[in-house]
Each structure stands twice: as structure tokens, then as C-alpha cells.
UniProtKB/Swiss-Prot annotation:
Pfam families reported for this sequence: Aminotran_5 (PF00266)
Gene that encodes it: sufS
Catalytic reaction equation(s): (sulfur carrier)-H + L-cysteine = (sulfur carrier)-SH + L-alanine; L-selenocysteine + AH2 = hydrogenselenide + L-alanine + A + H(+)
Descriptive protein name: Cysteine desulfurase
The protein's Enzyme Commission number: 2.8.1.7, 4.4.1.16
Pathway: Cofactor biosynthesis; iron-sulfur cluster biosynthesis
Active-site residues, as the UniProt record annotates them: 370 (cysteine persulfide intermediate)
Modification type N6-(pyridoxal phosphate)lysine: residues: 232
A GO CC term attached to the entry: cytoplasm
Oligomeric form and interacting partners: Homodimer. Interacts with SufE and the SufBCD complex composed of SufB, SufC and SufD. The interaction with SufE is required to mediate the direct transfer of the sulfur atom from the S-sulfanylcysteine.
GO MF annotations in UniProt: cysteine desulfurase activity; pyridoxal phosphate binding; selenocysteine lyase activity
Signal peptide positions on this chain: none
């Protein structure tokens, strides 16, 4: 299969517009990726001709819509190589997925005096829920620090895991630094360390950034949980996926109560809950979002996951080389990375640089990127972040470099 970025761009009409008199250069896909026509049209078709509430109706439209939603569950299981569709829980996004784990798994398995391990490179979505829970339960949160290259030193892990470590929760791909963590090796090492101390350790991987750049095989990774959002994968917002190992989901209590997640409700006899994954899907789901997610998976699969990765890696190599031509530009993170490039320009505030770039039609992200510990690590308040996607071109990178050089001249 031959990957053609020119052909891919035809699937994204938003990229044809001009911003401030310049062709749009969209380098903010790590925040949210643009949507291809096929995803938009599939959602529209469903709403126009097929929409109905799912799971509880016996009429034709409801039964058909239920089959479509459940087919996407099977599709996602296949896409990330889960063992069963029953290991796929639909959530609003990565943030809700991690909060679900914290409030269900965490309350069931983590006790006062226990500890968990997170890393210094985490998005706030994989920090705040654990601190909120720790305030209530009283467990310790241990932090795996970054090294000078923006990577994790695996030798340090042995000092963090002991017999009372219940969870290791870390990102697959840093949303700021582009660091690709060696997930399989980390998990293998962590499990070995826990086994040596007769501990019971589970592993959560935040796949929000990795899902659009890498093929994911949760069985090969040997993680217990893997979470990601649809809108990073060229799908709609408001829908995401929590993969959970079935034996764990079976043992976890529901987090939210309501319709659809029960077997029986009796004011006299009490409540019995549905089996996973439906136990964790209270209320009416984001039906159209699920349909759109299925269309997004169809789209990226049709392009070829290996081909996408090759295109993006070649583009990253090109971008890293070209950005070094900008004299006062400081890069953050490792030389080998995927998806995102964090930088600052001289002593200029990231907000000012981003505002100037916008005048040239270039969309990047500025700020702390919901990763304040990373900012603290590098002793800065904010960074600029350019991110790559399937529709990014070398011409986009060239435009960024030229604009940064102009800003250097303007701001001094």
C-alpha cells in the first residue's frame, strides 16, 4: 500500500482554507486531530437515517442501532488486539477513562499505606485523579523522574516498586516531549520487581497520544488497562475507550449508577449490576460518537498503520533537522521522538510566538499543555508545541521554519 499525503489531504477539506491571508498550516493535532470526510459523512448518515436509542428498544431502528454500536466495540477490540469485546468500555475520553479506573479499581484495590507509581511526564489527567483519591484513602504517590533527555531511566524503577505498590500508571507517548516509552520492557521489568517482593501490581497505560501514531497490541504490551480518546484518532469528540483486562473488570465495582448498568433494581431486595463492560456505561451513551469512532478506525486502517507510521517518522526526522536551522530555538525532549515537538524561541514567551505564528496561518499549541510538572522540570512556564499527523507535509514544516526565522528578526 502506497501512502500519499497529497491524497490524504483531499479527505480533510478544512485544510484548504486560508487563515490571515495564508494557507492554513495545522500543527495542533496532538490537541485534537481534524476529521476526514468519511467520518463526518458516516455520523451524518447515521443521524439522518439510522438514529435511535440503543440497548433497550425492541423496534427496528433501536435494534439496528444497538448492533451498530456493539459492532464498533468488536471493531475496537480487534484494532487494539484485545482478547474480547467485553474488555472494551466506552467512555467520554481518556480523562474519564482514568477517572473511572481511579474510582472503581482504586477504591477496590488500593488501601491506606499502599503506594502507586506515576511519572514526571504525565498529563494532568493521569495525575490529578490519583491525588484526589490519595487524599481520601491515604496511599503514597511515588514519582518516576525524567532524566536530562526527557526520558525515563529504567534503573530507577527498582527503587520505586515494593510489595505495597498496587499500580504503575504512565503514558505511552508524552504529549509534550514526544518521548516514546518502551512500554513492553517497562511492564516486564515492573512485574518482575513486584513478583520478587510478592506484590500484586497492575499497569495502566495512557495511550491518548500514541493511538494516532502507533499500532497498539494490548496483549503484547501485557498492560491491565489502556485508555485513549477518539478525537486524537481523527474521530469525534466526547467518546473514548478504556481497555481493561476482563478479570479485573469483573472484580471492579461500578463507578456511576443509572440506567443500562444494572441487572435488577428492587427497593426491597437491592440492586444487582450488569456484567462488564456495560456495568461501567451508565446512561445513554454517545451513540453518534461511537459510530464516528468506528468510521475513524476504518479510515486509518484503510491507509495502513505501518504506512502512517513511516510517513510520520520521515516527517519528524525532516522537522527536527529543519528546526535546528532556527538559531535561537530551544528544543525540549529526546532526539528520537514521535508526534510532537516542544520548543521555545529565545526568551520570548510561548504565547507571543504562537500569536505571531497564527498571523502566518500556522496553528500550534502554547502553554503548559496540562503537564505542569514537565514545565517545572525544565524551569519554564510554557512551551510552544507543534504536532504532526497523517496530513502534515514537508511544506508545512518549511512554513513553520520560515515563520520562526521571521519572528526572530522581528522580536530580536
Amino acid at each position: 500500500m502506497t501512502f500519499s499525503v497529497k491524497k490524504v489531504r483531499q479527505d480533510f477539506p478544512v485544510l484548504t482554507q486560508q487563515v490571515n491571508g495564508h494557507p492554513l498550516v495545522y500543527l495542533d493535532s496532538a490537541a485534537s486531530a481534524q476529521k476526514p470526510v468519511s467520518v463526518i459523512e458516516r455520523e451524518s448518515e447515521f443521524c439522518l437515517h439510522q438514529y435511535a436509542a440503543v440497548h433497550r428498544g425492541i423496534h427496528t431502528l433501536s435494534s439496528a442501532a444497538t448492533r451498530m454500536v456493539e459492532n464498533v466495540r468488536y471493531q475496537i477490540a480487534q484494532f487494539i488486539h484485545a482478547q474480547s469485546h467485553e474488555e472494551i468500555v466506552f467512555v467520554k475520553g481518556t480523562t474519564e477513562g482514568i477517572n473511572l479506573i481511579a474510582n472503581s479499581y482504586g477504591r477496590k484495590f488500593i488501601n491506606n499505606g499502599d503506594n502507586i507509581v506515576i511519572t514526571e511526564m504525565e498529563h494532568h489527567a493521569n495525575i490529578v485523579p490519583w491525588y484526589m483519591l490519595a487524599e481520601q484513602i491515604g496511599f503514597e504517590i511515588r514519582v518516576w523522574p525524567l532524566n536530562e533527555n526527557g526520558e525515563l531511566d529504567q534503573a530507577i524503577l527498582a527503587s520505586l516498586i515494593d510489595s505495597r505498590t498496587k499500580l504503575l500508571s504512565f503514558t505511552h507517548l508524552s504529549n509534550v516531549l514526544g518521548t516514546v516509552n518502551p512500554v513492553r520492557q517497562i511492564i516486564k521489568q515492573a512485574r518482575k520487581l513486584a513478583d520478587e517482593q510478592e506484590g500484586r501490581l497492575h499497569i495502566l497505560v495512557d495511550g491518548a497520544q500514541a493511538i494516532m501514531h502507533k499500532q497498539i497490541d494490548v496483549q503484547d504490551l501485557d498492560c491491565d488497562f489502556y485508555v485513549f480518546s477518539s478525537h486524537k484518532l481523527y474521530g469525534p469528540t466526547g467518546i473514548g475507550v478504556l481497555y481493561g483486562r476482563k478479570s479485573l473488570l469483573d472484580a471492579m465495582p461500578p463507578w456511576e449508577g443509572g440506567g443500562a448498568m444494572i441487572k435488577q433494581v428492587s427497593l426491597q431486595k437491592g440492586i444487582t449490576y450488569a456484567e462488564p463492560p456495560w456495568r461501567f456505561e451508565a446512561g445513554t451513551p454517545n451513540i453518534t460518537g461511537i459510530i464516528g469512532l468506528g468510521a475513524a478506525v476504518d479510515y486509518v486502517t484503510s491507509l495502513g498503520l505501518d504506512e502512517i507510521q513511516q510517513h510520520e517518522q520521515a516527517l519528524m526526522d525532516y522537522a527536527m533537522a529543519r528546526l535546528k536551522e532556527v538559531k535561537t530555538l530551544k528544543l525540549y525532549g529526546p532526539e528520537q521522538r514521535q508526534g510532537v515537538i516542544a520548543f521555545n524561541l529565545g526568551r520570548h514567551h510561548a504565547y507571543d510566538v504562537g500569536s505571531f505564528l497564527d498571523q502566518y496561518g500556522i496553528a500550534i499549541r502554547t502553554g503548559h499543555h496540562c503537564a505542569l510538572p514537565v514545565m517545572e522540570h525544565y524551569h519554564v512556564s510554557s512551551m510552544c508545541r507543534a504536532s504532526l499527523a497523517i496530513y502534515t507535509t514537508q511544506e508545512d514544516i518549511d512554513a513553520l521554519v520560515v515563520a520562526l526565522q521571521r519572528i526572530e528578526q522581528l522580536l530580536g
